[in-house]
A protein has these predicted regions:
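Small-residue-biased structural context
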Residues: 1-205
């Protein structure tokens, strides 16, 4: 699996806007009182892995099963269920790419910077291409969950609907909110810092 991901990241051709030219995201609600900007890079990566990646997989599966149950009685949720199924499948693939390829190298960059050392370049020369891939995935998920929000009338169940209907919509909103925190931390803090360290702590010949 890891060899396949390395080959994919090394050969993919991208033409996205550079990371620093993108429109910045506003800090999401779940994290508005947490000073992530002051955290060290290794702590941020650890938080993403142990909180966001774990919970994306755990609660994504839980919510999908709840959706299947409610959708079996309320077929207007068919499209929502399809979108969410595709989301958790794509997010699992996305997280795996980060865990197996990108984040280990970012941690190496952090350790090199802490020890004032230099390390060899990423296997495809720079981490900019895989970072742009990850950010493109983020954009896709934000668009997908915006569509879910629209399809559910801003996560509002029809009048008189069973409690389980509103409960699953509340869970969908919570999932989106924490996904936005996950994306914000990576887009606005982790990736820019990693690129800055790469500029100063990677051997160039």
């Amino acid at each position: 699996m890891q060899a396949h991901l390395l080959l994919h990241l090394a050969t993919v051709k991208l033409n996205f806007a550079p990371i620093f030219n993108r429109t910045k995201m506003n800090k999401p609600t779940p994290s508005e009182h947490i000073p992530f900007e002051k955290w060290d890079l290794d702590l941020l990566v650890d938080y993403i892995l142990k909180f966001h990646h774990r919970n994306t997989r755990k609660y994504g599966t839980e919510i999908y099963n709840l959706l299947l149950d409610v959708d079996s009685r309320h077929h207007e949720l068919d499209k929502v269920t399809d979108h969410f199924r595709n989301s958790i499948q794509d997010l699992d693939t996305h997280c795996t790419k980060e865990e197996q390829v990108l984040f280990p190298y970012i941690m190496n960059l952090y350790e090199a910077a802490e020890q004032n050392q230099h390390i060899m370049p990423f296997h495809c020369g720079t981490i900019e291409a895989p970072i742009n891939m990850m950010m493109a995935d983020h954009d896709d998920e934000l668009s997908r969950h915006e569509r879910i929000r629209e399809l559910t009338n801003n996560y509002t169940a029809p009048e008189g609907a069973e409690p389980a209907y509103q409960n699953v919509l509340d869970r969908l909103k919570e999932f989106r909110d924490y996904m936005m925190e996950h994306i914000w931390i990576e887009n606005e803090i982790v990736f820019p810092r990693a690129l800055e360290i790469e500029e100063t702590n990677v051997e160039r010949y």
